[in-house]
Amino acid sequence: MKIDLIISASDIKEEKIKNKTVVVIDILRATSVIVTALNNGCNEVIPVLEVEDAMKIVKDNRKKYILGGERNALKIEGFDFSNSPLDYTKDVVKDKTLVMTTTNGTRAIHGAMSAKNILIGAMINARSIANKVLELDNDLIIINSGTNGEFSIDDFVCAGYIIDCILKNRDAELSDIAITAHYVYSENKDIHSFVHKAKHYNILSNLGLKDDINYCCSKDIVDIVPEFHYPKITK
């Protein structure tokens, strides 16, 4: 197994991911929302690129759907919820379809469509993701969604943790950047303390979203592995 890493949604190249297993990560907060919603009984998640796309999907059967997402970390006007995983409780999401659009995460998911398998990963389900990757036994590309096309510490250390979980079970051939991600995690296993240095952490912290951050940095509290088969994500 070969493991490589892409540092942002803007850096995805089809030839790099084609026929590979891909894990898309946006721990602050899109993939954490997706994992949480599905774990709490949401039927499926439909990630879209634009607000207008989301509105078109829900317009004819509003009761079936929840609209969730953000632009610049803030709730979108007319949407039911923001991009906080804490919003997506069982009483809200059970038997519903979540239609979501975010600045970084949904773009990364759509960018991965030429992959063989697309798994939705976060710190909260990282070990389960690693186990699924081992089961699939294919070359792996981890896509960090990043922040507005830039590198994100938070996604990078999550990638390192997933790699660490894989390496505890088998050998793998790591690219230089995958080696670096694994090293960064190995030296910073207290995720909460490390992630506070991240640019995106400070954006969310300044908006009063520290509870979101603490939740999203929690390891392995969910054991599902969502998969994207266009146009929807299911567990």
UniProtKB/Swiss-Prot annotation:
Output the PANTHER family linked to this UniProt entry. Answer: 2-PHOSPHOSULFOLACTATE PHOSPHATASE-RELATED
Segments spanning the bilayer are none
Q: Which UniProt keywords apply?
A: Hydrolase, Magnesium
Q: Which reaction does it catalyse?
A: (2R)-O-phospho-3-sulfolactate + H2O = (2R)-3-sulfolactate + phosphate
Enzyme class, top EC level, equals: hydrolase
Q: Which SUPFAM superfamilies match?
A: ComB-like
Listed GO MF terms = 2-phosphosulfolactate phosphatase activity; magnesium ion binding; sulfopyruvate decarboxylase activity
Check the record and name the InterPro entries matching this protein: ComB-like, ComB-like_sf
Write down the EC number: 3.1.3.71
What is the required cofactor set for this protein? Mg(2+)
Identification of the protein by name: Probable 2-phosphosulfolactate phosphatase
Annotated NCBIfam families: PRK00886.1-4 (NF002055)
Q: Return the similarity comment.
A: Belongs to the ComB family.
| Top-rank taxon | Bacteria
